[in-house]
Amino acid sequence: MLFRSAVAEMVGGNRLLRIDSHGILTHVAGDGVVGDAGDGGPALAARFNGPHNLAVLPDGDVLLGDTWNGRVRRYHAGPGTVSTLPGFNAPPPAARTNGPYCITLTPDGRELVIADLRRVQVLTLSTGRLRVVAGNGKKGTPADGAAAVDAPLADPRAAAYDRRGNLYILERNGHALRVVGPDGRIRTVVNAAGAKGATGDGGPALAATLNGPKHLGIDRDDSVLIADAENHLVRRYSPSTGLITRVAGTGKKGAAGVGGPPEQCELNRPHGVTVHRDGTLYITDSYNHRVLRIVP
């Protein structure tokens, strides 16, 4: 997934890469071998295990969700070293379920939102305090209006806060987008039925269907971009209207159409969507092994 000037090569690559403003790609962390080593030493000698997501700190350091090691690692850009972020640990084999599949910073940059496949937690970076904000650890469909911390979730794959204090949670096997309001109550906003499908673009989001969505991003207007992976689409949920629309992809798996309208560009199981502060949308077109950019 690409954010600002960093790219993480996910799962199979076990590396962290960086693209600078001139388009030059540099390998900055990870030796490409599966493992759990390297804290305190050179980042290029460090080993990761299936990293799925990253977040860039205000100081330029990069947090990496080292998913199957069950930890969050920190790449220190200045000295070029790696360390483990204190406060979160899911020891193997629990890391396959409870590892950090998605990490996002809160809008103020002070806390880290961590989604595993059972719950969503928030880590205060200054203190290392970790608290659960959604999910009771059981798999199921949450009831609208339930307290989020007491509700089950169906494989929450990604989570992020908007600027109004709403927490959006994307469920991979629930095929749905939920929101937890500032009052701590959860409700469904996309796919009320929870059915697997690819319907509803241009209409009410509650009547739409998704298929194995993998990631989300919050746009500058607080709309939610969804990497609808198994539909080979990127879609947008607009809270102000309650509608869902197609942003990119034809719905057909493929690689054609780069350089043309985003809706005519084929995708192949996109696993990441990130909005730069200038409004540029980056799409991790995972099974085409490429990163795409949509300029506003």
State what each model feature region is.
Residues 1-2:
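Short, small-residue-biased leader/transition segments that mark boundaries at the very start
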Residues 22-50, 79-101, 127-155, 185-212, ...:
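Gly/Pro-rich loop segments of beta-rich domains
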Residues 10-11, 67-68, 117, 125, ...:
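Short loop/turn segments immediately following the C-termini of beta-strands
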Residues 56-59, 105-108, 161-164, 218-221, ...:
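Residue-level detector of Asp-centered blade-edge/turn motifs that repeat once per structural unit
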Residues 5-7, 61-63, 111-113, 166-169, ...:
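Conserved beta-propeller blade signature
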Residues 269-296:
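Blade-level signature of beta-propeller repeat domains, shared across WD40, Kelch, NHL, RCC1
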Residues 14-17, 70-74, 118-121, 175-178, ...:
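A short loop-to-beta-strand structural motif that recurs across blades of beta-propeller domains
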